[in-house]
Structure formats: structure tokens, C-alpha cells
Amino acid sequence: MSYEKVLQAGKTVVGTKQTVRALKEGKALEVIVAEDADPSIIDKVMEAAKEANVPVTKVDSMKKLGKACKIQVGAAAVAIIR
């Protein structure tokens, strides 16, 4: 379901740095994180999402999340933005 949401989203940013930036700038509507990503990386995204009061959805695979974003590598985090 969330993979489909990413595929259908008009605008997204991919990666933890860009996701955290979008959250801090108030641009993120929703965040999707991969459960198989390194927890120390995802914790930064989760904390920023909590501070910004943005919902977080977890998916099982970085590889599938990357594929949904149409990139050839895995993605730990993706933000759907305005």
C-alpha cells in the first residue's frame, strides 16, 4: 500500500538528509521509512517527523522503497511533499 502511495505521489524527496530537510522546512506531508534500514539513521527521521507532527508509515524493504521511487538502490526514507 505505501509503496503504491509513493508511486502515485506527485512530489517526493528520497533519502534521510532530504527527508529531514523537508520536515524541518514544513514541506513534508507524510514520511515513509524502511524497517530494514539502520536504526541510527532512521531515528533522526523519526525524531524530525515527531517534532513536525507528520505521520510516519513503515514499510519492510529499502530495496522495494527505492524501486517505488524509481531509483536503482535502496531508500531508507522518503517524504511525500507539498
UniProtKB/Swiss-Prot annotation:
This is RNA-binding protein GWCH70_0105. The keyword Iron does not apply. It comes from Geobacillus sp. (strain WCH70). GO terms for molecular function: RNA binding. Disulfide bonds: none annotated. InterPro entries: Ribosomal_eL30-like_sf, Ribosomal_eL8/eL30/eS12/Gad45, RNA_bf_YbxF-like. Belongs to the eukaryotic ribosomal protein eL8 family. SUPFAM superfamilies: L30e-like. It comes from the Bacteria. The lineage of its organism: Bacteria, Bacillati, Bacillota, Bacilli, Bacillales. HAMAP family: Ribosomal_eL8_Bact. Keywords: RNA-binding.
